[in-house]
Structures are given as C-alpha cells and as structure tokens.
Amino acid sequence: MAENAGLENHRIKSFKNKGRDVETMRRHRNEVTVELRKNKRDEHLLKKRNVPQEESLEDSDVDSDFKGQNVTLDAILQNATSDNVVIQLSAVQAARKLLSSDRNPPIDDLIKSGILPILVKCLERDDNPSLQFEAAWALTNIASGTSAQTQAVVKSNAVPLFLRLLHSPHQNVCEQAVWALGNIIGDGPQCRDYVISLGVVKPLLSFINPSIPITFLRNVTWVIVNLCRNKDPPPPMETVQEILPALCVLIYHTDINILVDTVWALSYLTDGGNEQIQMVIDSGVVPFLVPLLSHQEVKVQTAALRAVGNIVTGTDEQTQVVLNCDVLSHFPNLLTHPKEKINKEAVWFLSNITAGNQQQVQAVIDAGLIPMIIHQLAKGDFGTQKEAAWAISNLTISGRKDQVEFLVEQNVIPPFCNLLSVKDSQVVQVVLDGLKNILIMAVDEASTIAEIIEECGGLEKIENLQQHENEDIYKLAFEIIDQYFSGDDIDEDPSLIPETTQGGTFNFDPASNMQTKEFNF
C-alpha cells in the first residue's frame, strides 16, 4: 500500500509521466480487488473429496463383514494388514467409507491411528487393483482436508506411488490417482512444484484423448487448473509450455465443466506477469478465448473475462492482440449484464484499455463504451463505480485533448465529482487526479470546466477535502482550488472575492454569475 501511495503521489506531481503511468494505471488483480479474488476461490475448488452418490452392489458384497457392527479403528488397522485378501480389502474399504462420510470425516483419527503407511503400501499391490483403488480413494479424501492433513499424505511418500499408478492398466485406478494428485497439487506452490519435479505433467496430459470418459477428463482438467494456479512463485516456465497446447485443445470442448476449468487455467497463467502473458498469446489461444465473452453460460463468461482482463494488464502490444480480436464488441452486453460482478470485471478490463496508447483509447470511444462507463460511474455498485473512476482517470492521462473533451461532453464531471465524498481514499485521489488532468487539458477553457465542477457541487467537496487526513489528498485539493478557483480577475471585481473560513479555506457561492460558454478545448 505504501508503494501505491508513493506512485499516486508521483502521479500528482507529474502529469503525463508515461514511465509511471503504465505502472499505476494498468492494475493487476491486487489488494484493490481482493473481494473478487475471494469470489473466484469460492467458485473454484482447490481440493475435492470423493463422496459416492450411492454404494454399488459390488461394494456391499465386499464389506459385508463390517455391516451391522460398529467398526473400530483398531479393527480396521489390524485387518488392513491381514494376509487374507478379502479381509484386507474390506478393512481398507471400511476406512475409505469412514473418510467418504458426508459430515466430519475422522481424518485426524485415521492419521493418528497409523493407517497412512498401510494405505500407501497398498498402492504397490499391482496384483490387487481393487485394493489399490480403495487405498487411493482413502488417501484422496485424507489429502482433501487441511494443509496439515495433505502434508501427512505427502510425508508418507505416497506421491511417487500415485505417479506410478498413472500408468496402471486399470482406468479407475488411474483416475483415482489423478484425483489424489490434484488434491496434493492444490495444497499450494510447494506441493505443486514437488509433484511437477517428479514428472506428473506428461502422463497427466496423455489422458487427454477422444476415448477418455467425460468424468475422468473433468478430473484431469481440474488438476491442470491446480498446476496453473498460484503465482508466488508461478509454475515453472517449462510446465507452462507443456500445458498450453493441451489447453488449446480443451478450449474446444463442449462440456461446460471442462470449458470453465480450461479458461480458469488460462486466467491463472495470464495472472503471472508479462512473460507468461506472452506465452499464452504465442500459443494462439486468444482468438478462441475472446468469443467466450458472449457464451451463454455465465461461468464461462466470468472466466473468459478474467483471462482477457489479465492479458490487458500487460504491455500495449499484448493489449493490442486482444483488441485485434474484436473484443470490444462484446462489452455493451457485459456492461449491462444483470450480474454486478460481470459489470465490475468489464469496467476493470476497460480501465486497462484506457491506460493504453491513444489509439487504444480511441477504440473504446469508437465502440460507444464511454457513455456506458459513465453510467456505471453514476449508477453502479460501489465496486463498479471504483473501477469506472479508474477508467475515466486513466483516459485523462493517456488520452489526447479531443478524447478528454469527448469525456466532458458526455457529462462525466457530475458523477465523477459525486465520488469525492466517499470514504475510500484511493477513489477520492483517483477522481481528484482525473479532475486536475481535465483542467490541465482544458487550458483556456479551464474556467468552463471549473464552472461545471462548481455547479454540480464538486467545488464544495474539493474544499472539504482540504481538511482530509490523507496528505496527498488535501495537497491535491488545495492545488486545484488554488490554481482553478481562486480567480484571476478578483482585483477587477471585488464581489467575486469568496469569504474565508477560520481554517483559511474559501467558501464559494455556487450561484456566482459566471458567463456560460460552449465547451471546446
């Protein structure tokens, strides 16, 4: 936050300092939008527990010894090491069923019982694929728990055996191993990179073929998402290079779950800095990503909007790749979407376009989106208004005089000034920056702009901000008042001298008889 404050302070002092502008204006998903990130996490599970819908007849035959009695952990533990194949399988299955219970599975109790090494040993039993499957399932559900529970599975040396099971001739065993690895990778970047280092990517991607059952492919795609997730540190570049061709294939899939996961994977990769953005662009996927902004499923739209939004946090050249795909034609619908979260993401996207070069600013104007941004500035949810304030303020820095003039003609100043009374200091500063930039651009017409600001109640708000606790805000408010509202012709007309308050600030009469002029820079 301190760094952001420094950048904003510098912005006040140096209008049109391009080196700083791009850094501040192009905003990645950081602390400003933490609530969006939380929403994304809710939508996208890091870990999943395998809870069956109903037990099969096969299951009920195998575990008949355990039916009708309260099976103790001691009994499970003892029988899980039995030489009798049926008893051992029944015991491991009983453990799995305990872990598959809907409410509060006794994960910690099972870990404390010492069953982990026994389950891991069962993964080696190529002669008994049913035992491998049940043990893998039980371990999957243990790894679906807390980080400490996942770590217990990792420390029991299960990962190399799960990787080995990816080559099992039995598809259900392969799929369960994929699921377990997905939970371990989902624990965080350390586990992710450990599993990658043991060679998970190639065998995982080999499952992507036309003959794979849809449920299996959904799991594979979900694991790919977890491989792409986390940027502290991001996944190894070699891994990204390996995964991207698979994502370029999966983006054509008709299954909504697979499509959504594929697009989220791309959104995570594009959130990892300009180098990863370039890798995604070079994969050729962007022209197939952009049309998904108008997909009928909101889940697909949301993921696609985040992915393209991340790309336009990159360089002007990277941003242009997205613009060249006719991306702006999708935005009238996104800006009027019934879901507020999509409105907010759409305006965030556009704020990064208005932070670009003048041709990119013009593209937003030509697409007819400025009135829609101003509508969100005036009427949107506060989070959306905040993004709209950035979009407008960025345009006042990046745009030419005629582009800023167009903004004013669209009546941007009243809703812009309304945000000067919010409690969010960052928004207030962004608006003050924008107003000052408009006044600077107006040159000889600055008095006309000043009049508009005064008439909509903006002047009073700026005056009040001279008492703001934030130093940058009160200095900027003072500068605007001093430079544009102190009046050069006061000596000629004493009636124009405003009264001063005790604090030394000016009180203007909004009904002052200023001549109105047609606005024209």
What positions do the PLM features span?
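Intrinsically disordered, low-complexity regulatory regions
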Residues: M1-N84, L89-K97, L459-F521
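Short, flexible/disordered secondary-structure transition segments
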Residues: P52, S56-E58, I87, P105-P106, ...
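Alpha-solenoid helical-repeat scaffolds
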Residues: S60-S90, A94-L98, R103-D109, P117, ...
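Short sequence/structural elements of tandem HEAT/ARM alpha-solenoid repeats
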Residues: N70, D108-G114, Q151-N157, D193-G199, ...
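Buried hydrophobic core positions in alpha-solenoid tandem helical repeats
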Residues: A75-L77, I118-K121, L161-L163, P203-L205, ...
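Flexible helix-coil junctions and inter-repeat linker/turn elements that act as hinges
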Residues: N104, L116, S144, A148-Q149, ...
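Cysteine-rich, disulfide-stabilized extracellular repeat modules
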Residues: P106, A138, Q149, A158-L161, ...
